[in-house]
C-alpha cells in the first residue's frame, strides 16, 4: 500500500472477503440466539448467529456481534438474509449498510468476524416482531 491508507483498507477488505469465502463451506454447529427489544416495547427481534465451535459462541465479542445484528434487524426491517424472498437487495440483511458502521455492509461485517474468529460465521435465521 506504500503508506496509502485507502489502498491499505481496500487490500484488507479483499483479504477479509477471501478469508470468508474459504471458510464458507465449513459446517455451522454452534452459535447463539440473541434478542433485542426496542425501548418502546413494540418491536422485538430474535436472531440466530451460527459458528463452528462453542469456544467462539461463548466469546464476548461474538455475543456482542449477535446483539448488534439483532438491533440492526430491529432498525432496518430486512425481510430475508440474502434476498431469498426476491424482494430486492435493499431488504436483504447481508446487503444492507450496517447500522453501527454505515461504511460497510452486514456481509462485510460478518467477513471481518470470520477473519477475526477464524471460523465460518453466519446469520442462520431471524424473526422480527412488531405491534402495529
Regions found by a protein language model. Give the residues of each.
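N-terminal assembly/interaction segments in proteins that build large macromolecular machines
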Residues: 1-132
